[in-house]
A protein has these predicted regions:
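Gly/Thr-rich phosphate-binding beta-strand-loop-beta motif of the actin/hexokinase/Hsp70
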Residues: 2-29, 170-221, 528-534, 540-548
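Glycine-rich phosphate-binding/hydrolytic loop that grips phosphoryl groups
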Residues: 6, 46, 153-172, 235-243, ...
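Phosphate/ATP-binding catalytic cores across multiple sugar-kinase/actin-like superfamilies
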Residues: 95-113, 161-176, 319-359, 371-374, ...
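Conserved helicase motor "Helicase C" RecA-like lobe of SF1/SF2 P-loop NTPases
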Residues: 135-140, 368-390
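Hydrophobic, small-residue-rich alpha-helical packing segments that form membrane-like cores
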Residues: 139-184, 192-193
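Acidic low-complexity intrinsically disordered segments
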Residues: 332, 420-561
């Protein structure tokens, strides 16, 4: 293969991730390198505009400049301003400058990243964004220096997430037989960022060449719409936790205004406290405490304020957290149920949450324990459970990464990998034999849905039959074949021996008549042994072969499924 490099830029509301992957013979598929800025892989999507000279600072530098007390404006969440007409122009200016900053950082690290001469760059965007915004984002990457219109591409976040999911979970997906060639599945992606949470529901399929098709039927449901924002982003939790702490501080400072220093410390440190302490503690079902910095400041102020109350920090366990943030989870619950209802209107294979086959959860805000609990059918904050039956029955169908903020960026650089999805059966197959319309065999499940193809299965049925010693009456042995998700909902089809069928996926019911006569005298008990052999090919076509042996006499039959 020719060596080349893919750069993936996931430009998020509060955080940006840039990944680089080199493609060459013998590479490790899952290897990719992050653009490291300030010692971290997560770049805060921040721009600080200093007042006196208009100088711009980006990422952690912007954060440091703001905390140092420099006079100016800290621009945050400006990605969302692309959707607001009166703020759009300023948002475009900031995004262009931010992309230039990323490219300058890339150039500094380019030697260590071993970048090839041939480079492709991908930038992600929400599936619901308009063509106008997508064009602007791609052009911003081109203008920054990452490439030309021929080498810079856009990719939807759900598509990128699928590539990351398959790269990191390929073995499990095969083991659980969750994906197969030419078998569409219903996928729901929940992307929870700092600004918003978005649900995307679509049909996914891998073709015979293992090429991925997202919304292959042209139907991708993205909810909410561009002009309808639900307040389900991480910054809403920040605000609610700020209020929780502020209520405590008002009890500590009764009858007076909370000290400005405490207010500022509460607001500036809330995100780090949330991510490094509150979320991990609640994940383990343990209580969280106020940050050490806040407690130190309270103790210091207490020595100067004798009226301060010595009140312990209220226990922030799961119950208290869900009470304080109930409105947030109610909106997320509504967002999800509305998205599924919308999908049910346009995707015939989806009637409700029980029809979702695979769920992908991404974004930094998805790390809250409440998200997993809700997806697994548990009640959160007193809200009714959502019946994601297939996910509840098999939690392995709920996929997330250890670092969910990096999922989309990883998927952007993994998109050129080849995936080995084996040929598998689209349906279950059951066979039952019946002698003379009155003596049935057991029902044999000879093939399971998602079973690897090609495969050969067989079973044997032995039955006693009485007849005259000179003549055994004609025996009719019928072979009933049924395929599908279950026997109750299967289609029915009747055909004779050697009937030509299109494929295994088109057959349902077969009847084969096997008349034979044995000559003799007197009365005897005959042993009738029927052997069935099923051969299913890679393309899903199947042949059922049968041998009937009655005291040495054999009748053969073949059914083409």
């Amino acid at each position: 293969m020719n060596n080349y490099t893919i750069i993936g830029i996931d430009f998020g509301t509060s955080a940006t991730v840039v990944k680089v992957k080199n493609y060459y013979e013998g590479m490790n598929d899952s290897d990719c390198q992050p653009l490291m800025i300030g010692g971290g892989t997560i770049i805060p999507t921040l721009v600080f505009e200093r007042k006196n000279d208009g100088k711009l600072f980006f990422g952690r530098d912007a954060e440091s400049e703001y905390k140092a007390g420099s006079e100016g404006v800290l621009h945050r969440n400006f990605k969302m301003d692309l959707l607001i007409p009166e703020r759009k122009e300023n948002a475009q200016r900031l995004i262009k400058e931010f992309m230039k900053y990323l490219y300058q950082q890339f150039l500094l690290q380019k030697p260590q990243l071993n970048v090839s001469d041939t480079v492709k760059t991908f930038i992600s965007y929400p599936a619901k964004w308009t063509p106008e915004i997508i064009t602007f984002m791609k052009q911003s990457v081109v203008d920054a220096g990452f490439g030309t219109a021929d080498t810079v591409f856009g990719e939807t976040e759900p598509t990128a997430a699928i590539y990351a999911t398959f790269t990191n979970h390929e073995a499990m997906l095969k083991e659980q037989q969750l994906v197969a060639q030419e078998i569409p599945i219903n996928v729901m992606m929940l992307d929870m960022g700092a600004g918003t949470s978005d649900v995307t529901i679509f049909r996914f399929m891998a073709d015979k060449q293992n090429k991925f098709h997202i919304g292959h039927d042209g139907k991708i449901i993205s909810h909410p719409a561009v002009d309808n924002a639900y307040l389900c982003g991480g910054r809403e939790i920040d605000r609610l936790l700020c209020d929780y702490n502020l209520n405590y501080l008002r009890q500590v400072f009764p009858g007076s205004e909370v000290h400005d220093g405490l207010k500022q410390k509460n607001e500036s440190g809330i995100k780090e406290w949330k991510e490094t302490h509150v979320s991990p503690r609640l994940q383990e079902n343990q209580s969280a405490s106020i940050s050490g910095e806040m407690m130190t400041l309270i103790k210091m102020l207490r020595s100067f304020s004798p009226n301060m109350q010595n009140i312990a920090y209220p226990n922030l366990d799961r119950a208290a957290f869900e009470t304080a943030t109930k409105e947030h989870w109610r909106q997320l619950h509504t967002l999800i149920t509305d998205a599924v209802a919308k999908a049910a209107e346009v995707i015939p294979e989806i009637k409700g949450p029980e029809d979702i086959d695979l769920m992908i959860v991404t974004g930094g805000h998805s790390q809250w324990y409440c998200v997993r609990e809700m997806c697994l059918g548990h009640s959160v904050a007193g809200l009714p459970p959502i019946n994601f039956k297939k996910i509840i029955d098999n939690p392995k169908r709920l996929l997330s990464e250890a670092r969910p903020q990096e999922t989309v960026a990883n998927g952007l650089v993994f998109r050129d990998l080849s995936f080995d999805i084996t040929h598998t059966s689209a349906n279950n197959l059951w066979i039952q034999l019946v002698m003379d319309d009155k003596t049935p065999s057991d029902i044999y499940q000879v093939l399971s849905q998602f079973e690897t193809l090609p495969v050969q299965k067989s079973f044997e049925w032995t039955q006693k039959q009485e007849g005259g010693s000179f003549c055994l009456d004609d025996i009719n042995i019928k072979c009933h074949c049924c395929y599908g998700a279950d026997m109750e909902t299967g289609l029915s089809y009747t055909a004779g021996v050697n009937a030509a069928m299109n494929s295994f996926g088109d057959l349902f019911f077969k009847t084969v008549l096997l008349p034979f006569v044995l000559m003799g005298g007197g009365t005897e008990t005959y042993t009738v042994v029927t052997t069935i052999v099923v051969d299913v090919n890679e393309d899903g076509s199947a042949i059922v072969k049968g041998n009937v042996n009655c005291n040495g006499n054999i009748e053969k039959f073949v059914i083409n499924l």
